[in-house]
Amino acid sequence: MKLAIIGGDGIGPEVVAQAVKILDVVLPGVQKTTYDLGARRYHTTGELLPESVLAELREHDAILLGAVGDPSVPSGVLERGLLLRLRFELDHHINLRPARLYPGVNSLLAGKPDIDFVVVREGTEGPYTGTGGAIRVGTPNEVATEVSVNTAFGVRRVVQDAFERARQRRKHLTLVHKNNVLTYAGTLWCRIVQEVGEKYPDVEVVYQHIDAATIYLVTEPSRFDVIVTDNLFGDIITDLAAAVCGGIALAASGNIDATRTNPSMFEPVHGSAPDIAGQGIADPTAAIMSLALLLAHLGEDEPAARLDQAVASYLATRGNGRFSTGEVGERIAAAL
């Protein structure tokens, strides 16, 4: 296995370092290459993602990313020039976000809710393509448009992946959209889900409007198994899902090219948190959980399962203790 490692900004290098230590325990011998991409490189060279580096990244089996973003760089520069460019250049059309409430983790929801689902979010279309514009800017008659692009090809490949995941889980798929208002895109999504669903008679399919889905994520999260949705709605509900599962410090994600033509990229959902960078207090759990997703994606099912069990064991026994970044890594390694 050839793994590219991008620590990035803020606490990114710190949490990724712990994930790499865990990797060496659970799967020794992985070939690792570290890339200096982020604010430091941008300030030094003016580069965000050189073509030569992008070409090298393509030669790896997967990418492990820490975090991107720094207050010394104008907002959006690193995010668009590095993070989003990686996703689009490497065709990461699936954003995978598991949502699970582990034993020992407190939820904002009352009681002990049963939460274990996964969101399959389309990652390269919708309103995130940069299609749109503005006229008469700065005048009382300014007009701004943001176009949501949805293609049959793009929707179908994401829906196909979601059905496959549902078949391997509890065989229940929920399409989340807003087809009563977004009629063109909504009709496309509904039709393709229906067409693909004919090949999966064992998977139950239901539809929910995005506003209803946000209610049920809070009031009855156990009804969800696999959620498939577009880029914007997925962006919103995945953060809500993280909030009810213990917060983004425990949220892992995968940006996946399901064709495996390009390396997929795995990262914790949390940001770079520059205010605590270098203090040794950042929680690396989400980065380590992202490593488990990476291993599973590459077919390393046994190490991935062991790592998931080790994380669960750590979370179940940590209590209210506050541990340093290194201590968390050590405890999960010990659980392995």
Swiss-Prot record:
Membrane-crossing segments per the record: none
Top-level taxon of the source organism: Bacteria
Cofactor(s) needed: Mg(2+); Mn(2+)
Keyword tRNA processing: no
Cofactor binding annotation: Binds 1 Mg(2+) or Mn(2+) ion per subunit.
Pathway: Amino-acid biosynthesis; L-leucine biosynthesis; L-leucine from 3-methyl-2-oxobutanoate: step 3/4
Any one Gene Ontology molecular-function term assigned to this protein's record: 3-isopropylmalate dehydrogenase activity
Binding locations of Mg(2+): D211, D235, D239
Main subcellular location: cytoplasm
Biological processes, Gene Ontology terms: L-leucine biosynthetic process
Alphabetical list of Pfam families matching this protein: Iso_dh (PF00180)
UniProt cross-references to PANTHER family, sorted A to Z: D-MALATE DEHYDROGENASE [DECARBOXYLATING] (PTHR43275:SF1)
Protein name (database record): 3-isopropylmalate dehydrogenase
Organism annotation: Mycobacterium leprae (strain TN)
Underlying gene: leuB
